[in-house]
Amino acid sequence: MSESRSGTSAPTVLRMILGRRLQDMRLAADASLEDAAKALRVTPLTIRRLEKAEVALKPLYVEKLLETFGADRQEIDEFVDLAEQANEPGWWHSYRDAVPSWFTAYVSLETGAQTLRTYEPQYVTGLLQTHDYARAVLRGGLPNGSEEELARRVELRLRRQSLLEREDAPTLWVVMEEAVLHRTVDSPEVMREQIERLLDVSELPHVSLDVVSFDAGAHAGACAPFTYFRFAEPELPDIVYSEILSASVYLDQRVDVVAHLEAHSRMALLTSSEDSRALLNRMRKEYS
């Protein structure tokens, strides 16, 4: 997979749902990729890309495909309405001037997820960062960027955090390394404020925060940071996003997703919420 709300309205997520449903309709009608391509006068590869949500689905395409598959008028109208919603830009599209296109897909998945799990070996996860911490981290990754671009990226990062305040907020389970707390980002004052933020959010009923201490030794998480997404919609697969210095990847093959889930669970077993809060409180005092 190359790209990739607990309600359904994030455009990329809607496109994925629509693609999966169209594929199911095609298979139920015993129609081949070639049959569908002929109806739209496109190539079979284009149909495959439509079903995989790699390109936008025009409402007219949806209508013609469903007519080919023998759908009734009510089904056609419902699918066309879904296609129109999927083509509406999300709020994050207004930040396309400040972030790469692949990241807008990430925000769509994050906004649409019912469950989020993250592993962070170096920095506090973006959803829990304070303004000053986020600014320092983003500045480090944008050495030649303008102040305006930096400000836009910080604004986007903080706006993403509003999903934790929604009535239908997703559950968030963060596993992070103790090293994150020892890496002084910007200043002791910034770190103290950041740790206080972590202590506050760890009390939210839908947020779990586990800090793996140095005492845990070598463990399954000695790897790159990753985020796991699970959606309420049964059509959607679980997805893992992982990144390295110069690249990022979205994984939806079951074997890859399970490997990351198991690693996350094993790391969480190395600590507890109580131990994590105690460690956070100790580190807060060290930065005082």
For each feature predicted by the language model, list its residue ranges.
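Interdomain hinge/linker segments and adjacent boundary elements that couple functional modules
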Residues: S2-R20, D24, A28, L33-K38, ...
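Key DNA-contact positions within bacterial/archaeal DNA-binding proteins
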Residues: E34, P44-L45
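Short amphipathic helix-turn modules centered on a small-residue break
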Residues: R48-L50
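C-terminal regulatory/effector modules of DNA-binding transcriptional regulators
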Residues: V175, V185-S288
